[in-house]
Amino acid sequence: MRYEKGTMELSPARDIPLLQQVLRSGFVTGNQLYEFMRLEQTEGSRQAFDHRVRRLVGHGLIEKRPGLARGRHQVYSISKDGASVLIDAGELFAGRRNVDVVKQSCAHWLELNEVHLALWRSRALVRWTPATEICSQNLTSYRYAKDYDAVV
């Protein structure tokens, strides 16, 4: 199948879940993102995953965030265009405060991802409600007491 130069077709089975995970994670390393996709059984090949991430970065749906993590880990976050694609697809997202301004918030989100992954790997996790969904729900009458980072 041929596509017009500069355009891309998003896979509902592979691209959308990856974009959703980046959005819900706030900040996420490449290794964390691959582990989420592997645990969701949407990606089994690291090579295919890396190609998918490069393609989504190249089209401006995911942003690389250099210098935010120590070591050699690449950190990613959702771009405004990526969030817009997901909102158009029905994703709940009311925005996120202070996520783009403070380096410390990056470390916080990366640690939260590690907690999420550890609970998932141990099979102790029944349901994880991400901050994006909590903040969106808090705009309705069915609200939490505050904007939590996650509800387990």
Q: Residues of each region from the PLM?
A:
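Nuclease-adjacent, charged terminal/linker segments that flank catalytic cores
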Residues: 1-99
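Amphipathic alpha-helical segments that form well-ordered structural scaffolds
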Residues: 32, 114-118
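Intrinsically disordered, low-complexity segments enriched in polar/charged small residues
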Residues: 37, 113-114
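Active-site metal-binding core of divalent-cation-utilizing nuclease and nuclease-like domains
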Residues: 65-66, 104-106, 118-152
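Generic beta-strand structural signal
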Residues: 74, 113, 146-149
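A short, highly charged nucleic-acid-interacting micro-segment common to nuclease
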Residues: 96-113
